[in-house]
């Protein structure tokens, strides 16, 4: 289809020692779509993302970005990474650089922007993640949630065609998770194309347009976000039962409801939200 941004076909990854982490994964991501990948630890979720962004090389399979295969020897890895943003579990900020400089660095060195051009873009994206007041702070003076929001701003600044989120809240203290989830929800409402690996099941249900459930390196079930409430396979049923449903700590869900009502979206468990 014309609106397919990212296409994954028969993706395999075998690590040294014969560990077959990803076994024939297939899925598409459409323009403006949010796809959540869920599954137990070791199911291959993060490996899939790292293959997409060429941080590791798949053993077999095809990865296409807007119809162009990007996992070939001739593909320019740096160009691929500039088109596909990635936000990691850890924040990967430069500790010796202020917030503003962390965001402008890639714009100046990869995009070739002047300092003033880069700062204009950086200020815009930092405002989008509610970090405009901390532009002169160093990472060491920020909370974990603030660091992650700066990392999201840095990815947004490069104007990627799709952003990959690899467990963006797993390294955060429970009380800091809400602000990061709120930021990602805002991007979804803006129509940003995203693939999100997460253990936050309620968040996936309420924000994602589609869910991809991985089990032992394979797609065991895929469908609209409603499969969280109505799983079709026994494997997904077992997985959801093991997650004890609510992974968002007490108090944070209420915070997210109050902050999102201004956007016309209340996380009600239906998976319904406005689309741009």
Briefly describe each language-model feature range:
Residues 4-6, 12-208, 212-222:
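ABC family nucleotide-binding domain
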Residues 266-276:
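Long, low-complexity, intrinsically disordered segments
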Residues 216, 226-268:
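C-terminal boundary and immediately downstream tail of ABC-type ATPase nucleotide-binding domains
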Residues 50, 261, 273-275:
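Intrinsically disordered, low-complexity serine/threonine-rich segments
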């Amino acid at each position: 289809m014309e609106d397919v941004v990212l296409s994954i076909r028969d993706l395999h990854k075998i690590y040294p020692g014969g560990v077959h982490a990803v076994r024939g994964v297939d899925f598409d991501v459409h323009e403006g779509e949010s796809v959540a990948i869920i599954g137990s630890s070791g199911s291959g979720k993060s490996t899939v993302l790292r293959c997409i962004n060429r941080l590791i090389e798949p053993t077999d399979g095809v990865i296409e970005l807007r119809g162009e295969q990007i996992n070939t020897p001739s593909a320019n890895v740096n160009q691929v990474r500039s088109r596909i943003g990635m936000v990691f579990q850890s924040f990967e900020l430069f500790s010796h650089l202020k917030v503003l400089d962390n965001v402008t660095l890639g714009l100046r060195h990869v995009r070739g922007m002047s300092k003033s051009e880069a700062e204009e873009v950086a200020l815009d994206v930092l405002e989008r993640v509610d970090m405009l007041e901390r532009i002169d702070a160093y990472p060491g003076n920020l909370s974990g949630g603030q660091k992650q929001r700066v990392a999201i701003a840095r990815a947004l600044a490069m104007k990627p065609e799709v952003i990959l989120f690899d467990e963006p809240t797993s390294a955060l203290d429970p009380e800091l998770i809400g602000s990061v989830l709120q930021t990602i929800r805002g991007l979804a409402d803006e129509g940003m194309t995203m693939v999100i690996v997460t253990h936050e099941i309620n968040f996936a249900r309420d924000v994602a347009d589609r869910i991809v459930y991985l089990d032992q390196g394979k797609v065991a079930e895929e469908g609209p976000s409603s499969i969280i409430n109505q799983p079709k396979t026994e494997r997904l049923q077992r997985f959801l039962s093991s997650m004890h449903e609510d992974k968002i700590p007490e108090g944070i869900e209420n915070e997210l409801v109050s902050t999102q009502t201004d956007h016309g979206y209340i996380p009600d468990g239906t998976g319904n939200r406005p689309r741009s």
